[in-house]
Amino acid sequence: MTKQPFYKSLYVQVLVAIAIGIALGHWYPETAVAMKPFGDGFVKLIKMAIAPIIFCTVVTGIAGMQSMKSVGKTGGMALLYFEIVSTVALIIGLVVVNLVQPGAGMHVDPNTLDTSKIAAYAAAGEKQSTVDFLMNVIPGTVVGAFANGDILQVLFFSVLFGYALHRLGSYGKPVFEFIERVSHVMFNIINVIMKVAPIGAFGAMAFTIGAYGVGSLVQLGQLMLCFYITCLLFVLIVLGGIARAHGFSILRFIRYIREELLIVLGTSSSESALPRMIDKMEKLGCNKSVVGLVIPTGYSFNLDGTSIYLTMAAVFIAQATDTPMDITHQITLLLVLLIASKGAAGVTGSGFIVLAATLSAVGHLPVAGLALILGIDRFMSEARALTNLVGNGVATVVVSKWCKQLDEGTLQRELAGEGNASSPASDIPVGGREAV
């Protein structure tokens, strides 16, 4: 097979687009800010297809299983993995911020901070309790779940639909085949949308640099540097160790999903790569039913980057405002975040809302301190989103292996660059994942 020129690779195109966006934002900030609709438009196009893709993938995955016990086992294994790894991420963030103490010596008086810009985040955070979160998983209407694009609500309905379709047996086969064909159509739509990914990445990055300026990267830089290094070490050491224990290399895995990582880097939302991740993980050898359950669920229950951010940001605010935090306060913070972090969706800004909710719930920490990190939160969201994406990908492979639903040969071939999915020039193939 003849390789297409490197400049036609989505990986190269997005990388160049991000570089141009940064340059435009630095030299012509006013023009760069006007590019925001390109980034917003691309993310909206992706979100438009997420709900039906999740529905089709989950329904065909569950309905096509031999036994419902397999679904229960997969869900249980996934939740166990999510809880263990996200707890480790929270603890790592807590340990690092206590060792480095990036907020020490700032001596900020919370009463002097401008809280007008954080009012919306604080209000949104106060509204979300644990009971509210659990009740919100059940959609008011099926149409409402799809219209609002709520991942957990769509997932909840999809699991019920898939279970009901499975119970129908051969009588439900025409419905199963129809949904499978719709799935191919939806992945072709994503293939078309991804053609404009470089434009979306350019617009989002240009706006970020133009609106906040490169100078804002220097302000509060110690916290940002500390956070980025922690995320990097978490991916290489923690996720790398998990990957090695399950027979694959984290570096090869990162190379395999490099295009998705660049899309996330440009948009700062791990959700923007969700459809392609579902397709990529299936091509990696993970069973369709496992991918359909683990990837969407992970966007609320397995946000490793967000977990690191939440503990580091909360303790940073305490350090900067000279708010004492003894071991009891920190354990309380950890326990609150074990619950609150599960309510963060993989969309831009959700981590900041959960942080506001956490500060309100703990009570000991000044909510006004959010104003300290509001300016750099947009830059930190990129590290969060990248870590979240890698974490969910690793989780899918691990859970697939635990459930004996992983094709080891395909996994090794794809990660070695010998398969079609790992080729730099490959997008989602025209015609879907396979001919219908």
Swiss-Prot record:
Tell me the domain of life: Bacteria
List the InterPro entries.
C4_dicarb_transport, Na-dicarboxylate_symporter, Na-dicarboxylate_symporter_CS, Na:dicarbo_symporter_sf
Keywords from the named record: Cell inner membrane, Cell membrane, Membrane, Symport, Transmembrane, Transmembrane helix, Transport
Q: Where in the cell is it found?
A: Cell inner membrane
Write down the PROSITE patterns for this protein, in alphabetical order.
Answer: NA_DICARBOXYL_SYMP_2 (PS00714)
Q: Name one GO biological process term.
A: L-aspartate transmembrane transport
Topological category with respect to the lipid bilayer: Multi-pass membrane protein
> Main subcellular localization, coarse class?
membrane
Q: Which GO terms describe its cellular component?
A: plasma membrane
Provide the GO MF annotations for this entry.
Answer: fumarate transmembrane transporter activity; malate:proton symporter activity; succinate transmembrane transporter activity
* Signal peptide residue numbers: none
Q: Which residues cross the membrane?
A: 14-34, 45-65, 77-97, 142-162, 198-218, 223-243, 290-310, 331-351, 353-373
Region (Disordered) residue ranges read 414-436
The record's comment on protein family reads:
Belongs to the dicarboxylate/amino acid:cation symporter (DAACS) (TC 2.A.23) family.
- Role, per record: Responsible for the transport of dicarboxylates such as succinate, fumarate, and malate from the periplasm across the membrane.
NCBIfam families per UniProt: PRK01663.1, PRK13027.1
Q: What is this protein called?
A: C4-dicarboxylate transport protein 2
Which organism is this entry from?
A: Pseudomonas paraeruginosa (strain DSM 24068 / PA7)
